[in-house]
């Protein structure tokens, strides 16, 4: 399949991305809608989830991506492989996450990853970063107790900001105080492979969903 060429950066605050997603019938997509669900926010071309769905067939996988051509391409790859535990959805996660999970059985979301999100380096653009307080709040509402959130970045400031947002909520605790030295997921993302290939650091953190929220310590 010819690789789709797309714009590297998409402004999630643009009006065209403020519309809530049209929800498909997930029971028609997944062979077993009751399997535990792994969510990848900002899945890009979706190759990470494409591999995960094959490595862990007892799970369902959902990738969210704001660049529609990549979603179309990723679902085509899924169909070519005949995977019935994987789907990609075009949406703005900060707008549509709650609506998406109202369409799934309650308590189905067990794991979430946000891997190498767009850093939006300029200060005036940092409100475009994907990990905003609203996103963390939505994940706190739908992730099961004991559920895991994996955060990866090759930019330390971005990784710290993501960690601060989750620590500030009170429904999550960080499982290790320092960065994880190794990737504890069974598959490496495309970006992580490239970063490690250049002998550059990857900043990884794991957060766990608490049963009862703790008082906020860090301001978002």
Swiss-Prot record:
Active-site positions on this chain: 118
Cellular-component GO terms for this entry: tRNA methyltransferase complex
InterPro entries: SAM-dependent_MTases_sf (IPR029063), tRNA_(Gua-N-7)_MeTrfase_Trmb (IPR003358), tRNA_methyltr_TrmB_bact (IPR055361)
Matching Gene3D superfamilies: Vaccinia Virus protein VP39 (3.40.50.150)
Functional pathway: tRNA modification; N(7)-methylguanine-tRNA biosynthesis
A Pfam family this chain is assigned to: Methyltransf_4
This enzyme's EC code(s): 2.1.1.33
Binding, S-adenosyl-L-methionine: 40, 65, 92, 118
One function term, GO molecular function aspect: tRNA (guanine(46)-N7)-methyltransferase activity
Main enzyme class: transferase
Presence of the UniProt keyword Phosphoprotein in the record: no
Keyword terms: Methyltransferase, S-adenosyl-L-methionine, Transferase, tRNA processing
Residues that, per the record, bind substrate: 122, 154
Reaction equation(s) it catalyzes: guanosine(46) in tRNA + S-adenosyl-L-methionine = N(7)-methylguanosine(46) in tRNA + S-adenosyl-L-homocysteine
Highest taxon above the source species: Bacteria
Functional note: Catalyzes the formation of N(7)-methylguanine at position 46 (m7G46) in tRNA.
Family recorded in the similarity comment: Belongs to the class I-like SAM-binding methyltransferase superfamily. TrmB family.
Protein name listed in UniProt: tRNA (guanine-N(7)-)-methyltransferase
Organism from which the protein derives: Trichodesmium erythraeum (strain IMS101)
């Amino acid at each position: 399949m010819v690789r789709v060429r797309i714009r590297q950066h998409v402004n999630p605050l643009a009006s065209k991305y403020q519309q809530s997603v049209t929800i498909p019938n997930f029971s028609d997509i997944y062979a077993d809608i009751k399997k535990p669900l792994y969510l990848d926010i900002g899945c890009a071309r979706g190759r990470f989830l494409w591999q995960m769905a094959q490595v862990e067939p007892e799970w369902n996988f959902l990738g969210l991506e704001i660049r529609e051509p990549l979603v179309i391409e990723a679902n085509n790859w899924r169909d070519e492989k005949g995977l019935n535990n994987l789907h990609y959805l075009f949406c703005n996660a900060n707008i549509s996450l709650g609506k998406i999970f109202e369409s799934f059985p309650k308590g189905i979301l067990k794991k979430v990853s946000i891997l190498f999100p767009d850093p939006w380096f300029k200060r005036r653009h940092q409100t475009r970063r994907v990990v905003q307080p609203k996103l963390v709040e939505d994940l706190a509402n739908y992730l099961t107790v004991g559920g895991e959130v994996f955060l990866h970045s090759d930019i330390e400031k971005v990784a710290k900001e993501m960690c601060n947002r989750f620590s500030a909520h009170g429904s999550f605790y960080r499982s290790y105080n320092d960065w994880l030295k190794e990737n504890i997921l069974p598959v490496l993302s495309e970006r992580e492979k490239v970063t490690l290939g250049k002998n550059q650091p990857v900043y990884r953190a794991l957060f766990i969903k608490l049963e009862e929220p703790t008082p906020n310590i860090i301001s978002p």
